C-alpha cells in the first residue's frame, strides 16, 4: 500500500462528527490541500509543533508592536499548525508521549498566555482577563475529569435542542481549540480585546452548563 492509499484509508477512519470550525480546519483545508503533500516530506510532527509555538510567539510580539491584523493572522497560522501536527502524527504513525506533552504544553501556554499578555499590555482589564482564564480552565477541568468519565460509562447520551440538530447532521456544536483560536484571532484583528474575553468566557460557561445538563438528563 503506497502512502496516498494509506492516508486515504486513515481519512475514512477519521471520526464522522466534527465541530464546525474543526471541520473547516481539518477537512476543508488540511486534508484537502496540506496533509498528503506534507506526509511525503521528512518533516516531523514535533517540528510542526515547535513551528506552531514560534508563530504563537510572533503573534504575541506583533500585538506588542500594535500590528493587530498581522498578530491575528499569525495566531490563525498557529492554530492551523496545531491541527496539522496531530493529524500528521496519526497518519505517519509517529505519535509519541513526548510529542503529546509538547503539543499540550504549547497549547496551554498559548491559550492561557494570550489573555495574560493582553492584560500586561494594558489591552484588557484584570476582570476580563480573570473571567476568560477562569471560564476556560474550569471548562477544561470539568470536561476532562468529570464529563468525559461519565460519558465513558454511558452507552449513549441524550442531547436536545440545537446541539441535537447539528449532531444529527454530523456536527458538534460547542467550543473547541479551533473555534477558540478563531475568536481570539478575530478579537485581535478587530482590536476588540475586552469583548473577546467576555465572549470566549461566556461561550465556555454556556457550553459547560449544557454538557452538565445533558449528562444529568441522560442519567434520568
What are these regions (language model features)?
Residues 141-155:
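Membrane-water interface of transmembrane alpha-helices
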Residues 151-175:
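Membrane-helix boundary/juxtamembrane motif in polytopic membrane proteins
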Residues 45-98, 196:
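Membrane-embedded alpha-helical segments that form the functional core of polytopic membrane enzymes
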Residues 86-127:
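Basic, amphipathic juxtamembrane/active-site segments
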Residues 218-219:
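Conserved small/polar residues in nucleotide/adenosyl-binding loops
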Residues 1-31:
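Transit-peptide-like, low-complexity N-terminal presequences
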Residues 52-56, 107-115, 172-186:
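Core segments of transmembrane alpha-helices
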Residues 60-70, 113-132, 188-197:
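Helix-coil boundary and interhelical linker segments in multi-pass alpha-helical membrane proteins
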